[in-house]
Design a protein with these regions (language model features):
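Non-catalytic, mostly N-terminal accessory regions of nucleic-acid modification and defense proteins
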Residues: 1-195, 255-269, 365-368, 392-399, ...
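Helical mechanochemical/support elements of P-loop NTPase systems and associated helical scaffolds
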Residues: 6, 10, 28-31, 135, ...
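Short, contiguous acidic/charged loop-to-helix segments that flank catalytic cores in large enzymes
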Residues: 26, 287-313, 338-347, 367-373, ...
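Conserved Class I SAM-dependent methyltransferase catalytic core
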Residues: 29-44, 188, 240, 244, ...
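Conserved S-adenosyl-L-methionine
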Residues: 174-278, 282-294, 299-305, 316-317, ...
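Short, solvent-exposed loop/turn segments at the edges of secondary structure
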Residues: 225-226, 374-378, 391-392
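Short, surface-exposed amphipathic charged segments that create phosphate/polyanion-binding patches used
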Residues: 270-272, 376-383, 411-417
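Short, exposed interaction patches on small structured surface elements
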Residues: 398-433, 642-658
Length: 658
């Protein structure tokens, strides 16, 4: 199993166990929320502590034969938290049922806060007194499975985010508004691409924008704590605690102040921020107009006032604030209600002034149901105060409402590949052709790797294992078939199965050889657009073959099931001593499990080919072009003719049916 899939499986299993425990303990989500997040934080701190402890200890100086003790500073240099013995997770897990676990956890949290001023008053403590001792013991054990002791990288950071996601879905805190979907935050961060400087989120919630910004820096093999300085504003005290824990769990620090951003600006970053990223509340109508009308963060004026003296809609207050925070080379990316891009009257006047600055860079429309708490569609706005002169009167409009992956019946997101494909459009817009070509080439290589894994993956062999499982199932039925003698030939599913298995084996072997040949050919592949397009066309045959093999897998299993049913229902197999029902059931289950794994692996081949095809069909010359229903580069004249609307769907047209 791939590392990412392995982590996802761990996340789901941990959440399921924790949620089941909550259900069995009669606690509401809002009662269970902070204690669970606090223990996820503590478990991660312990993981990082262990990860660097041995290396630190090996390099400690000695004097008179004595090694200097470990210190907080040793661990800070490694972006890890120093844990006193009482705060180490194994110590807490090992507590007997007779011990007061709540007291022990509180003491663990207090010891961390005593050493780290930025976490003082942040970690959950008294909340643990609300949970009974047995529930705490079970929760500690749940968060400490054996497999988590062997994983590497930022696994607990991911688990922390996953738990935030699930709690947001349950509206466990602040009606879920504290959390912005990771796929939207990631897209914003990767469009802006923070390099170095100040990152401000004036509505920071649980701090996701900071975490994703850090990941962008880490992918360049740079240290985000050296490159970026994080500043946040947030009105909810509990949410600030979540954000500070989120930063700490990723080895980051930030200055997050409690403030109502409409009226307060404690960081005083007017015209000073290098990057602004945010997901503010949508369509707020409670901002006191008198309090903000002279605010220097409103360079385009108030966007309308209602009869109650309130700003009629707060969307353009937020947008104006974001713009005003930027320095002369700053970039902003934020989530906004889809109403804002075409709002009329006073809001349209503000929008016109903003467009006329030449700093509106990119607009991306997102379909509904990306949020756990809002069903409405939204848009991502990108401002850039340091644009190429040739682009200053243009805006890139991307309508991504048809780009999504279904997560649950009600929730959507972007797959990693969908996010990359949208970013590829931005790269072409910026003239970064090399990144686009590298992505296409990467998809081709991934397709071939997935094809090779069909025959032999890291820990198993999906297609050969399925063939072997079928043979075992066929063998489990064979003793009974022998009792039928020549009559076995009249069992229709048997004939079909025995004909289909050799054919599948031959096709699977031919596929394996074809993949091997294409991998050999790839070693001399040129990464030019023309040569890559030829490769995509050449690999189309493999993609179709993998789909055919999927159909064959399903057919073979159906034939095997029909054979069993025919033996039992028409040939009275259950009455025969030669029919071992237990062996047949076991073999049937094993064959189905092997089929699922083989089919999942085979589908990956065509999936990655489809990604290459999606890009090369839409951008055949590896250059940005208008694509109906997806993207259009719009100039200011056209925007003015459309009431200064910044709604992508108004310009890109309707996508043709595929």
């Amino acid at each position: 199993m791939a590392q990412l899939e392995h982590i996802e499986a761990i996340e789901k299993r941990l959440w399921s166990a924790a949620d089941t425990l909550r259900a069995n303990s009669n606690y509401a989500s809002n009662e269970y929320f902070l204690p669970v997040m606090g223990l996820v934080f503590l478990r991660h701190a312990y993981s990082r502590f262990l990860g660097v402890k041995d290396a630190i200890a090996a390099n400690l100086p000695t004097r008179a034969g004595k090694t200097r003790p470990l210190t907080k500073e040793d661990f800070s240099q490694k972006s890890a938290i120093f844990l006193q013995p009482q705060a180490q997770f194994d110590t807490l897990v090992a507590l007997p049922d007779s011990a007061d676990r709540a007291k022990a956890i509180i003491e663990a949290m207090e010891s961390i806060e005593a050493d780290y001023e930025n976490l003082r008053g942040v970690l959950p403590k008294s909340e643990y007194q609300e949970l009974d001792n047995a529930a705490l013991g079970e929760l500690l054990r749940t968060l400490n499975p054996e497999e988590l002791k062997r994983v590497s990288g930022d696994v607990f950071g991911r688990i922390y985010e996953y738990f935030l996601t699930q709690f947001a879905g349950e509206k466990a805190h602040d009606d879920g508004e504290f959390f912005t979907p990771v796929s939207l935050v990631s897209l914003i961060a990767n469009v802006i691409e923070p390099g170095s400087g100040t990152v401000l989120d004036p509505a920071c919630g649980s701090g996701g924008m900071f975490v994703q910004s850090a990941r962008v820096v880490e992918r360049r093999h740079e240290n985000p704590t050296e490159k970026l300085t994080f500043y946040g504003l947030e009105k909810n005290a509990t949410t600030i605690r979540l954000a500070k824990m989120n930063l700490a769990v990723h080895g980051l620090e930030g200055d997050i102040q409690r403030a109502i951003t409409y009226y307060d600006d404690p960081h005083e970053l007017l015209h000073k921020a290098d990057y602004v990223m945010a997901n503010p509340p949508f369509n707020v109508d409670e901002i006191d107009a008198d309090k903000v009308k002279r605010d220097p963060r409103l360079p385009f004026g108030l966007p309308g006032v209602n009869k109650k003296g309130k700003v009629s809609n707060g969307n353009y207050v937020w947008i104006s604030y974001f713009y005003s925070y930027l320095n002369e080379r700053g970039r902003a990316g934020f989530v906004m209600s889809s109403q804002a891009s075409s709002a009329g009257r006073d809001e349209a006047a503000v929008r016109r002034k903003l467009v006329e600055t030449g700093d509106v860079d990119i607009m991306i429309a997102i379909r509904s149901n990306f949020f756990y708490t809002r069903t409405v569609p939204c848009e991502l706005w990108f401002l850039n105060r340091d644009r190429q002169e040739a682009l200053r009167d243009k805006v890139l409009m991307i309508d991504a409402r048809n780009v999504y992956r279904k997560v649950t019946r009600k929730i959507y997101d972007f797959s990693p590949e969908q996010e990359q494909n949208l970013l590829a459009i931005v790269w072409l817009y910026r003239g970064e052709t090399g990144r686009y070509l590298d992505l296409v080439a990467g998809y081709c290589q991934r397709m071939l790797a997935e094809g090779a894994a069909c025959a032999r993956a890291k820990h198993f062999s999906p297609v050969p294992d399925f063939i072997a499982a079928l043979a075992t199932l066929r063998g489990a039925v064979e003793p009974f078939l022998m009792t039928l003698g020549v009559g076995a030939k009249n069992v229709s599913p048997l004939r079909e199965l025995d004909d289909a298995i050799p054919l599948f084996k031959a096709d699977a072997e031919a596929f394996r050889k074809a993949v091997s040949e294409q991998q050999a050919a790839w070693k001399t592949q040129k990464i030019s657009n023309g040569e890559l397009k030829k490769a995509v066309d050449r690999l189309a045959t493999l993609a179709e073959t993998s789909r055919d093999l999927v159909k064959q897998c399903d057919l073979l299993y159906k034939l095997a099931c029909r054979l069993i049913e025919t033996c039992e229902n028409e040939c009275n197999a259950r009455d025969s001593d030669a029919w071992n029902a237990r062996d047949v059931i076991r073999a049937r289950k094993a064959a189905d499990e092997a089929r699922v794994l083989a089919v999942e692996q085979l589908k990956q081949v065509r999936y990655f080919w489809k990604q290459t095809n999606w890009l090369t069909e839409r951008f055949p010359e590896a250059e940005l072009r208008n694509v109906e229903g997806l993207v259009k580069l719009v100039d200011r004249t056209e925007i003015a003719a459309n009431d200064w609307s910044l709604t992508p769907g108004r310009y890109v047209g309707i996508a043709p049916e595929e």
